[in-house]
């Protein structure tokens, strides 16, 4: 499953980077990220949760920031239990466009938790909902 979403925020890139580079802040703006606790060494314990009516699906995993520069941030699943796990990659691309910042979010998941058709759409809607949450927080900061 892959999903991409973009938002343009009327703020400079420097105002956006703190909100997208620290997974601990994602629960404030991204409905998909229910909990994200910093573990140190650019790693977080994350619980992803998506609701379908009264039902919820959740997944706990360890994510690590594997790339961070002025225009691109990448988080990848990196478990430490020695077992093989499905890939989960979240890539954030930032582009300054005049007085605005274009934020592109790309999520790729290789597992089957979210692949039941309906859950794909729910996951995509949760990611899309994060766009307005991110813009609200950046404007308030």
Question: What are these model-derived regions, one by one?
Answer:
Residues 1-43:
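Hydrophobic ligand-binding cavity/cleft-lining segments
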Residues 5, 33, 60-67, 87-96:
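Hydrophobic/aromatic beta-strand elements that line small-molecule binding cavities or substrate pockets
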Residues 8-12, 47-51, 66-68, 93-97, ...:
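Solvent-exposed residues in well-ordered beta-strands and their adjoining turns
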Residues 16-20, 26, 44-46, 65, ...:
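Hydrophobic pocket/interface hotspot
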Residues 18-31, 124, 128, 132, ...:
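Short, intrinsically disordered, mixed-charge
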Residues 37-79, 136-141:
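Glycine-rich portal/gate segments that line the openings of hydrophobic small-molecule binding cavities
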Residues 76-129:
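Beta-strand/loop substructures that line and gate deep hydrophobic ligand-binding cavities in soluble
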């Amino acid at each position: 499953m892959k999903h991409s979403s973009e938002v343009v925020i009327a703020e400079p890139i420097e105002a956006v980077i703190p909100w997208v580079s620290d997974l601990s802040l994602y629960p404030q703006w991204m409905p998909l990220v229910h909990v994200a606790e910093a573990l140190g060494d650019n790693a977080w314990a994350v619980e992803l949760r998506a609701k379908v009516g009264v039902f919820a699906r959740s997944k706990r995993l360890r994510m690590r920031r594997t790339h961070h520069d002025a225009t691109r941030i990448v988080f990848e699943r990196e478990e430490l239990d020695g077992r093989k796990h499905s890939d989960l990659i979240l890539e954030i691309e930032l582009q300054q466009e005049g007085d605005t910042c274009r934020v592109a979010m790309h999520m790729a998941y290789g597992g089957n938790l979210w692949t039941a058709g309906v859950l794909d759409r729910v996951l995509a809607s949760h990611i899309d909902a994060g766009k307005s949450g991110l813009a609200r927080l950046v404007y308030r900061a």
